[in-house]
């Protein structure tokens, strides 16, 4: 049984009740309602049963009174431990058609074809919603038609306005000019000198070597590129993870009188021989100092 509520109040001559999963008898419920509502001068009462999909029985009741009640007790219509859903019947004809669809209905009295007309304020609100073309116009129309609501419920009205007229995202305008975003020359030179165009991780995907070896390979390629192009050590070199890696000139295999070591070769043969370019050989797989 529901607890008493200070907010409950029923003031309608036309009432629609639904008793869900009710094990009572229909005729007993009908008699209970008739006796309970007699002081309000019953004009019509109809009670119908409905077999629900889960096998339980629902009871519906349409009540039409000649005298408007003022019921504050939410348990007023409770019957044998069953509490109904209570709501005003705004269209009695629709309610009667609904509850009598299964044909099992008991009635008493003269039915009134009653229908509650929409309030004039609802029509005014509908006009505002349908005719406003922007958020500003919507709020201005409400301010004109319903000044009290505008003054006391502006926060909720702005919320509904944003739902009707979603704000368009503003186009981003960068606070920086194009010249501000250009790389300064000293930073550009530092980047080209100290940073590779390919990361060490990307290099190891193509050349299966260790991290340290990959770093050494990239440094060697950068130095070699500068040397071949006659550039200084502070001049940027182009490196790529999948570029062709030059083999280091072999040692004794080139010439019988070639001197090996870290110093430059004095053999005319090796000095005039161009570097051998290989797509499969990396610095990590060839000797950095030649053959011993």
Curated annotation (Swiss-Prot):
Binding site for a divalent metal cation: 50, 58, 60, 102
Co-factor note (free text): Divalent metal cations, possibly Mg(2+) or Mn(2+).
Pfam families: Gemini_AL1, Gemini_AL1_M
Entry GO CC: host cell cytoplasm; host cell nucleus
Positions annotated as active site in the UniProt record: 98
Intervals of motif RCR-2: 58-60
Motif RCR-3 positions after renumbering to this chain: 98-101
Domain of life where this protein originates: Viruses
CRESS-DNA virus Rep endonuclease domain boundaries: 9-111
GO biological process: DNA replication; symbiont-mediated perturbation of host cell cycle G1/S transition checkpoint
Cofactor entry: Mg(2+); Mn(2+)
Effect on the protein of changing residue 189 to S: In strain: Mild
Motif RCR-1 location, chain numbering: 16-19
Predominant subcellular localization, coarse grouping: host cell
Compositional bias of kind Low complexity: 255-292
EC number, as in UniProt: 3.1.21.-
Enzyme's top EC category: hydrolase
Chain residue ranges for the region called Binding to RBR1: 181-185
Complex and partners: Homooligomer. Interacts with host retinoblastoma-related protein 1 (RBR1), and may thereby deregulate the host cell cycle. Part of the C- and V-complexes which are RepA-Rep-DNA complexes involved in the c-sense and v-sense transcription.
Family: Belongs to the geminiviridae Rep protein family.
Note on domains (UniProt): There are three rolling circle replication (RCR) motifs. RCR-2 may be involved in metal coordination. RCR-3 is required for phosphodiester bond cleavage for initiation of RCR.
Known function: Implicated in enhancement of V-sense gene expression. Acts a an inhibitor of C-sense gene transcription.
Protein name from the UniProt record: Replication-associated protein A
Native organism: Bean yellow dwarf virus (BeYDV)
Taxonomy of the source species: Viruses, Monodnaviria, Shotokuvirae, Cressdnaviricota, Repensiviricetes
